[in-house]
Amino acid sequence: MSRRDDRSDNLICSFCGKSQEEVKKLIAGPTVYICDECIELCNDIIAEESKLEEAMGPDVKKLPKPQEIKEVLDEYVIGQNQAKKVLAVAVYNHYKRIEAMAKPGEVEMQKSNILLLGPTGSGKTLLAQTLARILKVPFAMADATNLTEAGYVGEDVENIILNLLQAADYDVERAQKGIIYIDEIDKIARKSDSPSITRDVSGEGVQQALLKIIEGTVASVPPKGGRKHPQQEFLKVDTTNILFVCGGAFAGLENIIQQRIGVKTLGFGADVKKKIEKKAGELLIGVTPEDLLKFGFIPEFVGRLPVLASLTELDEEAMVQILKEPKNALVKQYQKLFEMEHVKLKFTDGSLVAIAKEALKRRTGARGLRSILENAMLDIMYEIPSQVMVKEVVISEDVIYNKEKPIIVYESVAESA
């Protein structure tokens, strides 16, 4: 036991030697004592080491294997198994490449950026976000429709790097091993598959500008964003090891694929149209780089996105699963909100099917589920915090269709006693 020799009754910290009168707290262990100041110092040391580990990027020895990555993706994203496999392998190989490139004399490996093709609300953004969370790397998103090449009104392409830098708390080393997701990438395709002699500010010009940062360059980023000017100081960010994931719906690409594989349509009947629509998602699975060239992408841009993953349109069953099964499922989120009011929230099976059908009707995919639920739940979420003795709230199919109000079950007098 730690005591001062001259004052045997006075306990001291076993690490710094200060007495209990000199510190705020002295915590006892089986044979030692530690003061609050030493605890704080230990926490600072651990925090600094954690920051250093994060800056170095994912350790390949600790990097989850492709199967493990897919298992975590399964917890958050319903279906899309083939796309998950493609992403898991691509991301695993990307960070192994970074480790290999750090060693002198290794074979030079090209970066495997990813292109996700699939309808709105099929899970493209969520997949990219979840990957970054699994790997504990900075993540940033950008909308390709807002981008223009340098010198034109709009957002500079290099501002994407600034977003990643902000996500990394301006730690350049961490940012250089992050993931950037660029949505609506199909919107920057040029209007025809032949080169244009006029300036295409939001199409081919943006592709050319993105090409530089995607393939790897040292970008000069204004620390506060906005446009560059000569008197400004810049942060230098090397994009060589940043993984770029681009996504888009690619409406009309299925027609290009149909022409290539020789699928012909007959007449204009409703049955034929329905059949073609059903096949559209399946056709995207067979997309080739040549199809993307015809869609309006320049060869260099397609070449920098070698990994292609197609997502299919979600059906009613998948929508219902999305509502209740993932770790962050909407139903679980609303139930937690009501639980904080000491109220049990129950959704009938019919209500979940009704929500799924409404989302399919709106053609907004999984991202439309929340707005449907918010609309149906608004009144009851407004009323419940002010009510007393509410035990349970039941949401039925008719509540979703605004035909009736939720069922409220109150506690009996005996239960509350």
UniProtKB/Swiss-Prot annotation:
Q: Which InterPro entries match?
A: AAA+_ATPase, ATP-dep_Clp_protease_ClpX, ATPase_AAA_core, Clp_ATPase_C, Clp_protease_ATP-bd_su_ClpX, ClpX_bact, P-loop_NTPase, Znf_CppX_C4
Q: State whether keyword ATP-binding applies.
A: yes
Alphabetized SUPFAM superfamilies for the sequence: Glucocorticoid receptor-like (DNA-binding domain) (SSF57716), P-loop containing nucleoside triphosphate hydrolases (SSF52540)
Residue positions annotated to bind ATP are 119-126
Q: Which GO terms describe its biological process?
A: cell division; proteolysis involved in protein catabolic process
Q: What's an example GO cellular component term for this entry? A: HslUV protease complex
Write the record's keywords in alphabetical order, separated by commas. ATP-binding, Chaperone, Metal-binding, Nucleotide-binding, Zinc
Q: What Pfam families does the annotation carry?
A: AAA_2, ClpB_D2-small, zf-C4_ClpX
Q: Where is the ClpX-type ZB domain?
A: 1-54
Q: Where does Zn(2+) bind?
A: 13, 16, 35, 38
Q: Cite a single GO MF annotation.
A: ATP hydrolysis activity
Q: What does this protein do?
A: ATP-dependent specificity component of the Clp protease. It directs the protease to specific substrates. Can perform chaperone functions in the absence of ClpP.
User: Which family does the record claim for this protein?
Assistant: Belongs to the ClpX chaperone family.
Tell me which HAMAP family the record gives. ClpX (MF_00175)
What name does this protein carry? ATP-dependent Clp protease ATP-binding subunit ClpX
Q: Record the organism.
A: Geotalea uraniireducens (strain Rf4)
What gene does the UniProt entry assign to this protein?
A: clpX
